[in-house]
Amino acid sequence: MRVLVTGGSGFIGTNLMEHLIDAGEEVLNVDWNPPLDPGQRVLWRELDIMDEEALARAFAEFRPTHVVHLAARTDTEEQHDLNAYVQNHEGTRRLLNAVKACPSVERLIVTSTQFVCEAGHQPKDDLDFKPFTLYGESKRLTEMATREARLSCTWTIIRPTTIWGPWSLRYRDVMFKVMRKGLYFHPSRRKVIRSYGYVGNVVWQIDRILRLPAERMNGRVFYVGDPPFDLRIWVEAVSKALTGRPVRYIPTWVVRALAVTGDVFRTVGLPFPITSGRFRSMTSDYITPMDRTIEALGPAPFTLEQGVKAMVTWYDGGSEHIAHPARKVVGHG
């Protein structure tokens, strides 16, 4: 395979690049940020997917047989202006044009998100959307653009759940740092079922989609990640690996009050370990339908314990020296 990865400098992209390199595939990462892993820099081409001419040149020169489209703005901070996520839906349209103009492309994976459906909404079919954030809406538009593109290659849409693992700067900065200092408290012992995914399993699932027979993958939508589980199991495993101790629990109302305080800090630009959004994600079920993914792709290879061990090893192996990518202005031309 000759695999072109958009957004290969990010969290999932860095892990995917490592996997494909180890598998001996020819790989090109097109991203407007440099790779998190300096060792992958030789395979990076600086490129804004909103730049159609540069994108077309990259395709023409590399001649990929397979494309994995990960590039996106993935936060949920913007609540008023959908155009803040223009690189998601419009960027995907431009990527699709580049794919259509490149006859070597045999397969395409387009990345959406579980947030095209709000928590509690179990979609009846692939077009049963219920986004609850502008980010989720931008990904709904991404999915529709893919369906309407009339692609001649095999295409598949993936919807990642909450993904964790090595190279996640969000978990490094928000959860791990607080937990290692002994400042993490979990809100109550109530069972909360969440759809999470170890990044190694997600990369394995992407690889399966690239390799399985085209007729089984074409036009399909798959949630990628692990089967839903009790969030406490994951939190306890991380705590024991990081600190050697079980998690400490405090009443839900205390954490809710801290979250409100965090909201105030956030409005003035000050960091705080918990906000109302984070509180809701820690105390609300969010279950995605993984059965179809497992049936089509098979069970993923890594256990939760293996994933936690790999992530903590990465965290303790110099992750503090990895800088956050610079914020850039999206080109609309």
Pin down the residues of each PLM region.
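Active-site Tyr-X1-5-Lys
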Residues: 132-156
